[in-house]
Design a protein with these regions (language model features):
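Bacterial N-terminal signal peptides
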Residues: 1-8
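Short, low-complexity N-terminal intrinsically disordered segments enriched in polar/charged residues
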Residues: 11-65, 69, 188-189
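Low-complexity, intrinsically disordered terminal/linker segments enriched in charged
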Residues: 18-31, 156-189
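A solvent-exposed, acidic/Ser-Thr-rich amphipathic alpha-helical stretch
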Residues: 64-116
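A short, polar/proline- and glycine-enriched secondary-structure boundary/capping micro-motif
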Residues: 88, 130-133, 163-170
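Short, surface-exposed coil-to-beta transition loops
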Residues: 103-106, 136-142
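A short, structured loop/turn motif at beta-sheet edges
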Residues: 111-118, 145-153
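A short hydrophobic beta-strand element
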Residues: 116-126
């Protein structure tokens, strides 16, 4: 969930890489025939519990001790800034993203099922080491797929990246300016 926000706080890269949407489409295609746990089964309930617990307190220690219980070996993860394939890469990415956070918690909403796809809304509360007096709250949506054992095989996060861009000294000025101009234009129609 909104892990890439932490990238902007702690890493020197100033612009996000271009996301290759074909990789996301391929991951969706690859996982489309995987049967998820039965609805309302113990396996499904345990998967939801692991997901909620994992993101409830997002820290390097919790990631290291729980990520392999939550994600399958060949899992795919995507957010607006990164695409990551395989449990080792996912673990490395998650730990790197947690490093610049003083604290990071996610409130996970009810997980909804549509056939073999699962969706949930979430709210992230982040306090970064770089700006501990400026807590950040962001909302997003997760789309995921589970294998029969209840492990995540596909995870894609959707969220408004301007929440974090607004916090960057130069970029923030421009994103706020653009948003204000869009709002003014909408109010004049």
């Amino acid at each position: 969930l909104m892990l890439s926000f932490l990238t902007l706080i702690g890493c020197s890269r100033s612009t996000p890489p271009e996301i290759d949407l074909t990789q996301i489409d391929q991951a969706l295609q690859r996982t489309s025939n995987t049967t998820a746990p039965a609805p309302h089964s113990d396996i499904e309930a345990a998967a939801f519990e692991r997901f909620t617990h994992f993101y409830n307190e997002y820290s390097a220690d919790r990631i290291a001790s729980n990520v392999r219980n939550l994600y399958a070996k060949d899992a795919f993860f995507a957010d607006p800034y990164h695409l990551v394939q395989g449990i080792d890469s996912i673990e490395d990415y998650f730990i790197a993203m947690a490093a610049p956070a003083q604290s990071c918690t996610f409130e996970i909403g009810k997980i909804q099922r549509a056939e073999n796809d699962f969706y949930c809304r979430w709210t992230m509360h982040l306090i970064s080491n770089a700006a501990p007096d400026q807590p950040i709250i962001a909302q997003g949506l997760t789309h995921m797929r589970l294998n029969p054992a209840g492990k995540i095989i596909f995870h894609q996060d959707y969220w408004d990246t301007s929440v974090l861009l607004d916090r960057l000294p130069v970029v923030g000025f421009w994103t706020k300016l653009v948003k204000n101009r869009i709002l003014k234009g909408m109010n004049h129609e």
